[in-house]
From Swiss-Prot:
GO BP terms: gluconeogenesis; glucose 6-phosphate metabolic process; glycolytic process
Identification of the protein by name: Glucose-6-phosphate isomerase
Subcellular location per the Swiss-Prot or TrEMBL entry: Cytoplasm
Organism of provenance: Bartonella quintana (strain Toulouse) (Rochalimaea quintana)
CDD domains, per the entry: SIS_PGI_1, SIS_PGI_2
EC number, UniProt record: 5.3.1.9
InterPro entries noted in UniProt: G6P_Isomerase, G6P_Isomerase_C, Phosphoglucose_isomerase_CS, SIS_dom_sf, SIS_PGI_1, SIS_PGI_2
Active site: E363 (proton donor), H394, K523
Gene name linked to the record: pgi
Length: 559
């Protein structure tokens, strides 16, 4: 297939049509019974099949959401009014849909098949991408088979990835998730400017057998460069300055700055300005993943995402999993007013997945201004949070079941675990996941609680005291994502599903999901305060709180 960049124009949607569709949806939401999930199951014995979609072994079950067939019809009308399909095509054709930075958004190109062509500014992106992938594969295989050695001639057995944000969250999450596929060096991750992070990591490593990846597009990210300099001095103090070129590689587009650091040009892995940080795991930022699991498994990871890309691009509206997922997210956030969503992977190796989605979702859709420069008149992206099951059950599930706020839950489940000899134990995990989903939906009435308490021998007076405390309202919405096994392919597909879901939610909200000016603002202020904190500048024209905090910190340091 051949793709071609189509220019910068991005159509402006018909706001009157969208507002009419949204108001129709809001009116529908006020009707009795729409949110009554229990009743929906009673009235439709085939609700599961009517309200679920499949893509090979991926099951997307949204039957436990407070919606009806009419809700789906109105949501589809909303998608048409928002021009979801047109905006989708704009992304796939290379239009500059990141309007504030005038950039194309082409992380999808990073996982395109090798025989496809995607022309942008006279270059075939697929060929450029494959060249970088081949570079990554050659280098990673040399490290993995021991032919690439450190400065003393010893084999590299530890990798330290130094990055932050998308240069850390994605690589760390994926590397941890794919632990059963590790047959390469041990991988460590350093991101925080807290000196404890780099110090604790280096304390257990041998300089002679350690390789550092410095992951920074601009090679100016403050936290990353600070940690990189500490690592550089650590190598120099043990092995000498000449060892830097053997013990450091970079993922960056700033070739001059990387060269100044002392990294050989043959060990610089390129990526492009159309790769956003939170979408960069598919690029050379994934080098640490490839070092851990090998090139073949990394390509399977890309293939899984590619399958979801293809489904997102060609599946009709009513059968399109990312679009349906996004419409439900919009329904929950904007129409129902649910302020957060809980991501609960019943997979310990996906324990970092909620944190990964926090950046992917909240950095993308935590916006208050529309594409046409107007303040939004509804709530934008939800707070995203979560933890792995069953751990979360013993921490915050109490609030999910009986708290005053309704919080939609997104369960992620795999039918099988990698530890086949522990299969009976894995059944406990699966049973708990299914039980929590059912409990949130079904609840337990006061009458049922009374019957249970009386049957257990508790007297009537005590029963009345306990009944309300032990009852559950139910009708709490949840979505279930089920796949066979956590593999490079299924993980890639899962991440791409969430990427496209978040993109479509941004379309519905009419915002730019691909900039992050709030993050940039924080960096700007930190750069202003740093020389003041170090006593190099005076603290003029600051608010009293900032001045007071600076004075307190400096005074305590001098004691």
């Amino acid at each position: 297939m051949r793709y071609k960049f189509m220019g910068d124009s991005l159509s402006i949607r018909n706001e009157k049509a969208f507002e009419a569709a949204l108001q129709a949806l809001r009116r529908h939401a006020t009707k009795d019974g729409v949110y009554d999930i229990r009743r929906h199951f009673v009235e439709d014995e085939q609700r599961f099949s009517h309200f679920s979609l499949r893509l090979d072994d991926l099951l997307f079950d949204f039957s436990k959401c407070g919606i009806t067939f009419k809700t789906l019809q109105l949501l589809d009308d909303l998608a048409v009014a928002a021009d979801v399909l047109g905006r989708r095509e704009a992304m796939f054709s290379g239009k500059a849909i990141n309007t504030t930075e005038k950039r194309s958004v082409l992380h999808i190109a990073l996982r395109m098949p090798t025989d496809e062509v995607f022309m942008l500014d006279g270059h075939d992106l697929v060929r450029d991408i494959q060249d970088v992938l081949a570079h990554m594969e050659r280098f990673s295989e040399m490290v993995r088979d021991g032919s690439y050695k450190g400065n003393t001639g010893e084999k590299i057995i530890n990798i330290v990835n130094i990055g932050i944000g998308g240069s850390d969250l994605g690589p760390a999450m994926v590397t941890h998730a794919l632990k059963p596929y590790h047959d390469g060096p041990h991988c460590h991750f350093v991101s925080n400017a807290d000196t404890a992070h780099i110090s604790d990591t280096l304390s257990v490593l041998n300089p002679a057998t350690t390789l550092f990846i410095i992951a920074s597009k601009t090679f100016t990210t403050a936290e990353t460069i600070a940690n990189a300099q500490v690592a550089r001095q650590w190598i120099i103090s043990h092995l000498g300055e000449e060892a830097v070129c053997r013990h450091f590689v970079a993922v960056s587009s700033a070739l001059d700055k990387v060269a100044e650091f002392g990294i050989d040009s043959s060990r610089i892995f390129k990526f492009w300005d159309w790769v956003g940080g939170r979408y960069s795991i598919w690029s050379a930022i994934g080098l640490v993943v490839m070092l851990a699991i090998g090139g073949q498994n990394f390509r399977q990871f890309l293939n899984g995402a590619q399958q979801m890309d293809r489904h997102f691009k060609i599946a009709p509206l009513h059968k399109n999993i990312p679009i349906r997922f996004a419409l439900l997210g919009f329904w929950h956030r904007v129409v129902c007013g649910y302020a957060s969503r809980a991501i609960i992977p019943y997979a310990q190796r996906l324990a970092r997945f909620p944190a990964y989605l926090q950046q992917l979702d909240m950095e993308s859709n935590g916006k208050q201004v529309s594409l046409d420069g107007k303040t939004l008149n509804f709530s934008s992206g939800p707070v995203v949070w979560g933890d792995s099951g069953t751990n979360g059950q013993h921490a915050f599930f109490q609030l999910l079941h009986q708290g005053t706020d309704v919080i939609p839950v997104e369960f992620i489940l795999f039918i099988k675990g990698h530890e086949q000899n522990l299969h009976p134990m894995y059944d406990i995990l699966v049973a708990n996941c299914l039980a929590q989903s059912k409990a949130l939906m079904k609840g337990r009435s006061v009458e049922d609680v009374r019957r249970i308490l009386v049957k257990s021998g508790i007297d009537v007076h005590e029963t009345e005291k306990l009944a309300l405390h032990k009852s559950f309202e139910g009708n709490r919405p949840s979505i279930m994502l089920v796949q066979d096994l956590l593999t490079p392919f299924t993980l890639g597909r899962l991440i791409a599903l969430y990427e496209h879901r978040i993109f479509v939610e941004g379309i519905l909200m009419n915002i730019n999901s691909f900039d992050q000016w709030g993050v940039e603002f924080g960096k700007e202020l930190a750069n202003e305060l740093l020389p003041i904190l170090r006593g190099e500048n005076k603290a003029n024209n600051r608010d009293s709180s900032t001045l007071g905090l600076l004075a307190y910190i400096q005074a305590r340091r001098e004691e």
